[in-house]
């Protein structure tokens, strides 16, 4: 049993959907030690507990660029077919253990070519690990559905190539495209031709926006990338003015961009703990209770809750939901709403969505 409960229900037992979860941010510390030993990688700690603590400490810098430096270690042990296969398999098994029934794994294949893998071989290795894990979950009476989000690094110049990679694997595990890396100064419009290619092929994209940069970045992601979801999207709150707040009600005025995102129900992939670590919510405060996620949720935005990087944040989706229950007194209805939001935003077929939505509703009803 987890320590996180809502209305007397263990949150870990609830069906969950994870949309924003980085493969190179979800390694088990013991796996890093073992894979690192195989390649002679020098690590900052020699046991799993200490290594996990090191990642958490390094990630609490309040700076997105500093936070991203921790990935130098995780990607170093993910440069072979064996390493990628193992990491992907364990990643999915850990999701299933946490109650996730549908998950999308985002990762950037271009960061995993240092030991001779091709882009396609890297994607195939991850897919093989995913499929092995799905089979293991099924053999124990469970079920989990997983898709790959193939990411391009926004500050590099391979987006067109990575977009074509995603399209080659659209029927072999890839369900969507993403751009990641430093957001500020690297708008989606830099990669316009890649997004044009994807749009012409009717392939969905989510874009990291509203994390390391503000509403101009969000607007650009929606316009240039035709983003169906916003990775984090937290800083859309910069376009909301609170005009009056009492114990009974809150009166706000939405700017045109915020109104568009709300009215079109564009999915916000909010990652609360990560947002604290990277300073995303610094303008509102430094505690989780300062995070605009509750305001966005109460106003009817399509909020979803995600772990982002389970290793760096020392977290799980259960924990992220539990923290919001503690901070904002969310109840089962709130958790079901954000979970259904995630199902609606998932890059799957409409038939798969309907099945997923029913499974979520039944799962919550059974625990009420």
Regions found by a protein language model. Give the residues of each.
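Metal-cofactor-binding active-site regions of metalloenzymes
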Residues: 1-203, 211-229, 235-368
């Amino acid at each position: 049993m987890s320590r996180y409960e809502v209305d007397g229900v263990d949150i870990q037992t609830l069906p969950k959907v994870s949309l924003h979860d980085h493969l190179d941010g979800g390694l088990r510390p013991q796996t890093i030690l073992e894979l690192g030993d195989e390649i002679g990688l020098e690590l900052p700690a020699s046991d799993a507990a200490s290594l996990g603590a090191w990642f958490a400490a390094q990630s609490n810098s309040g700076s997105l660029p500093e936070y991203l430096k921790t990935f130098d270690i995780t990607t170093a042990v993910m440069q072979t077919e064996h390493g990628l296969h193992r990491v992907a398999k364990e990643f999915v098994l850990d999701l299933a253990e946490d109650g996730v029934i549908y998950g999308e794994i985002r990762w950037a294949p271009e960061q995993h070519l240092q030991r001779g893998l091709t882009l396609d071989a890297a994607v195939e290795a991850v897919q093989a690990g995913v499929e092995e894990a799905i089979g293991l979950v099924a053999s124990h009476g469970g079920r989990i559905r997983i898709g790959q989000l193939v990411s391009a690094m926004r500050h590099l110049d391979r987006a067109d190539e990575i977009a074509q990679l995603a399209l080659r694997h659209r029927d072999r595990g890839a369900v969507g495209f993403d751009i990641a890396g430093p957001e500020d100064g690297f708008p989606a419009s830099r990669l316009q031709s890649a997004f044009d290619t994807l749009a012409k092929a009717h392939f969905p994209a989510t874009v990291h926006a509203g994390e390391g940069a503000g509403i101009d970045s969000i607007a650009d992601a929606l316009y240039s990338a035709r983003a169906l979801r916003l990775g984090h999207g937290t800083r859309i709150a910069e376009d909301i003015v609170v005009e009056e707040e009492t114990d009974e009600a809150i009166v706000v005025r939405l700017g045109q961009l915020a109104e568009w995102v709300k009215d079109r129900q564009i999915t916000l992939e909010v990652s609360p703990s990560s947002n604290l670590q990277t300073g995303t919510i610094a303008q509102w405060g430094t505690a989780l209770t300062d995070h605009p996620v509750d305001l966005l949720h109460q106003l009817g935005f399509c909020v979803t809750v995600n772990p982002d990087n389970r290793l760096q944040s020392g977290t799980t989706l259960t924990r992220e939901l539990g923290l919001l229950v503690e901070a904002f007194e969310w109840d089962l209805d709130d958790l079901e709403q954000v979970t259904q939001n995630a199902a609606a935003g998932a890059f799957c077929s409409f038939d798969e969505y309907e099945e997923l939505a029913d499974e979520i509703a039944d799962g919550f009803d059974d625990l009420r």
